[in-house]
Amino acid sequence: MDKEEEPHPLLQDLHRPLQPCTNKCYCKKCCYHCELCFLQKGLGVRYHVSRKRRKTSTQDNQDPIRQQSISTVQRNGQTTEEGKTEVEKAAAAN
């Protein structure tokens, strides 16, 4: 009777931390294949904090149009005095 009683294997499994599962499928069979998949895929429970992705923006990769200010992009949108005089000269020549 000096022999210590070992707990049941089911109780050992309950207290063991969940092993990571690398299965990426969300079908019904894969969602119920283990406890971790059921919690994550079936119920949508996440116990880890998801990291937000950093913006990996460098000056070389950005579009030059987006870097310019609004006034710079639309600078040729309005007529100028030089444009008016050229049009008037062309009209007077006809």
From Swiss-Prot:
Subcellular location per the Swiss-Prot or TrEMBL entry: Host nucleus, Host nucleolus
Keyword Iron: no
Top-level taxon of origin: Viruses
Motif residue range(s): Nuclear localization signal, and RNA-binding (TAR): 49-55
First-listed, main subcellular location of the protein, grouped into a coarse class: host cell
Residue ranges, compositional bias (Basic and acidic residues): 81-94
Region described as Cysteine-rich: 21-37
Biological processes, Gene Ontology terms: positive regulation of viral transcription
GO terms under cellular component: host cell nucleolus
InterPro entries to which the protein is assigned, alphabetical: IV_Tat, Tat_dom_sf
Extent of Polar residues compositional bias: 58-80
Positions of the UniProt region annotated as Disordered: 51-94
Molecular function as annotated in GO: RNA binding; RNA-binding transcription regulator activity
Entry coiled-coil feature ranges: none
Core, as annotated region: 38-48
Keyword Thylakoid: no
Keywords for this protein: Activator, Host nucleus, Host-virus interaction, RNA-binding, Transcription, Transcription regulation
Function in brief: Transcriptional activator that increases RNA Pol II processivity, thereby increasing the level of full-length viral transcripts. Recognizes a hairpin structure at the 5'-LTR of the nascent viral mRNAs referred to as the transactivation responsive RNA element (TAR) and recruits the cyclin T1-CDK9 complex (P-TEFb complex) that will in turn hyperphosphorylate the RNA polymerase II to allow efficient elongation. The CDK9 component of P-TEFb and other Tat-activated kinases hyperphosphorylate the C-terminus of RNA Pol II that becomes stabilized and much more processive.
Family per similarity comment: Belongs to the lentiviruses Tat family.
Subunit field text: Interacts with host CCNT1. Associates with the P-TEFb complex composed at least of Tat, P-TEFb (CDK9 and CCNT1), TAR RNA, RNA Pol II. Interacts with CCNT2; the resulting complex is unable to bind to TAR RNA.
Name of the protein described by the UniProt record: Protein Tat
Gene assigned in the entry: tat
